[in-house]
Swiss-Prot record:
GO terms for cellular component: chloroplast thylakoid membrane; photosystem II reaction center. Signal peptide: none annotated. One of the components of the core complex of photosystem II (PSII). PSII is a light-driven water:plastoquinone oxidoreductase that uses light energy to abstract electrons from H(2)O, generating O(2) and a proton gradient subsequently used for ATP formation. It consists of a core antenna complex that captures photons, and an electron transfer chain that converts photonic excitation into a charge separation. This subunit is found at the monomer-monomer interface and is required for correct PSII assembly and/or dimerization. InterPro entries: PSII_PsbL (IPR003372), PSII_PsbL_sf (IPR037266). Its main location: plastid. The chain crosses the membrane at residues 17-37. Belongs to the PsbL family. Keywords: Chloroplast, Membrane, Photosynthesis, Photosystem II, Plastid, Reaction center, Thylakoid, Transmembrane, Transmembrane helix. The keyword NAD does not apply. It is found in: Plastid, Chloroplast thylakoid membrane. The keyword Thylakoid applies. It comes from the Eukaryota. This is Photosystem II reaction center protein L.
Amino acid sequence: MTQSNPNEQSVELNRTSLYWGLLLIFVLAVLFSSYFFN
């Protein structure tokens, strides 16, 4: 029964890593767009 907690933590960690990945891609897209427009 106690194994459900680590699983929830791993899922939460995956969500946070996914959000950081999307944020990183968004920042890179903004930098590349500003670079091309300049």
